[in-house]
A protein has these predicted regions:
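N-terminal beta-strand-loop-alpha-helix module at the start
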Residues: 32-109
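Short gly/pro/ser/thr-enriched loop/turn and capping motifs at secondary-structure boundaries
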Residues: 82-84, 101-104, 125, 152-153, ...
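Short phosphate-binding loop-to-helix
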Residues: 116-137
Length: 258
């Protein structure tokens, strides 16, 4: 307070009395937003950084996975997913989990300690959740999960539930299914003859359109508890649009639809 009891002197820390401070705070906020966007996407206008998470359970072959190491920004193996990763020719950047289901512990010997993140068996997250979180924390905005087929039904349902989260994976590939998240539009070439099914995420998915399917989705609304099962891709190019809500699309691998 200046002598004589006048108004407080303008200060860089007193934004109400210092327009320059307000402008500085605004610029700082925008800089932080840009930095966060750059971390997740790789830069303005760039595609999201791609992460690959290998987990325990039956996984796809290399052709069904379709991922190339040079296109993946970060690969993480969760527990027994390490064996699947190495089987498919991927050496993960990090191995995470409690390692209780990794049958061959000697596989860990090829990784330095700073690339193995160990967690206790008694924890609030599954190894899959930990792997997904690690990828997110390291800037991956487009995550594919490989593995998780067969085995316990509760584990399968828990992985499927990840697609309901705020930052879901984009894809999950097992030995028998290629599962994709469709938020607005999906397009693929080369699936002609494949069996595909569609399930809504959340309360409903509506305003749908499609091209290249035997039974078009045009005008349909899938509410929670309903699904479109055993559709078939009839053209080289298939496209699906969702107006409101989200869809899970399940492509059957290696078997004829029932």
């Amino acid at each position: 307070m200046p002598a004589g009891g006048g108004a407080p002197e303008a200060s860089p820390f007193n934004g109400r009395n210092n327009p320059k401070a307000l402008e500085g705070f605004r610029r700082l906020h925008e800089t932080r937003k840009t930095a966060i966007l750059s971390l997740v996407t790789g830069g303005e206008g760039a595609s999201p950084r791609r992460g690959l998470l290998f987990i325990g359970g039956a996984g796809p072959d290399r052709e069904s996975l379709g991922e190339r190491r040079g296109e993946v920004w970060l690969a993480v193996a969760a527990d027994a997913g390490l064996a699947l990763a190495l089987q498919l020719g991927f050496e993960p950047d990090l191995v995470v989990g409690d390692m209780d289901s990794l049958s061959d512990r000697s596989l860990l010997d090829r990784f330095p300690p700073d690339r193995v993140l160990r967690f206790p068996q008694d924890k609030d997250e599954t190894d899959t959740e930990i792997g997904l979180r690690v990828l997110r924390e390291r800037g991956c905005g487009d995550v594919t999960i490989a593995g998780g087929g067969g085995g316990r039904v509760d584990h399968l349902l828990a992985i499927a539930a990840l697609f309901e989260r705020e930052d879901p994976p984009r894809r999950w590939v097992t030995d028998g299914a290629d599962i994709r998240l469709i938020e607005e539009e999906f397009e693929v070439i080369g699936w002609e003859g494949s069996t595909v099914s569609f399930l809504p995420l959340g309360s409903q998915a509506s305003g749908m359109r499609s091209e290249g399917l035997q039974w078009p989705l045009d005008g349909l609304c899938f509410r929670r508890g309903y699904a479109g099962i055993s559709n078939r891709v009839m053209a080289r190019r298939m496209r699906v649009w969702v107006g409101t809500g989200k869809l899970l699309m399940v492509r059957t691998l290696g078997e004829v639809s029932r």
